[in-house]
Curated annotation (Swiss-Prot):
Coiled-coil intervals: none
Propeptide: 23-44
Keywords carried by this UniProt record: Disulfide bond, Secreted, Signal, Toxin
PROSITE patterns: SPIDER_CSTX
Organismal lineage: Eukaryota, Metazoa, Ecdysozoa, Arthropoda, Chelicerata
Designated name of the protein: Toxin-like structure LSTX-D1
Disulphide bridges, residue numbers: 48-63, 55-72, 62-87, 74-85
Predominant subcellular localization, coarse grouping: secreted
Annotated GO MF terms: toxin activity
Length: 115
């Protein structure tokens, strides 16, 4: 019985050692592959469409404001048949940005008082 326990402990030790060696080898190969892919990567970012400019050519190209991305909103002008699309910021997001800005300013004042 003691011999069986000894062999099982030895087997588990060798198995864990060999598996960690295989994982380390796999990690180093994967890391080298990732580095080579990152070196060959090219920048694909295109210019964004500013607020209140036409976004009908690409509805997902609106720029980001400080916290949120602007939304391409389409509408028909009064008396017109053509659809007009512009990048706009929804009002609820505008109010959220204002509230966040005021909270930052208030936090700065508190830091001055107690900091």
């Amino acid at each position: 019985m003691k011999v069986l326990v000894l062999f099982s402990v030895l087997f588990l030790t060798l198995f864990s050692y060999s598996s960690t060696e295989a994982i380390d080898e796999f990690d180093s190969d994967a890391e080298e592959d990732m580095l080579s892919l990152m070196a060959n990567e090219q920048v694909r970012a295109k210019a964004c469409t500013p607020r209140l400019h036409d976004c009908s050519h690409d509805r997902h190209s609106c720029c980001r404001s400080e916290l949120f991305k602007d939304v391409c909103t389409c509408f028909y002008p009064e008396g017109g048949d053509n659809e007009v699309c512009t990048c706009q910021q929804p009002k609820h997001l505008k109010y959220m940005e204002k509230a966040a800005d005021k909270a930052k300013k208030f936090g700065g004042k508190i830091k001055k008082w107690f900091g």
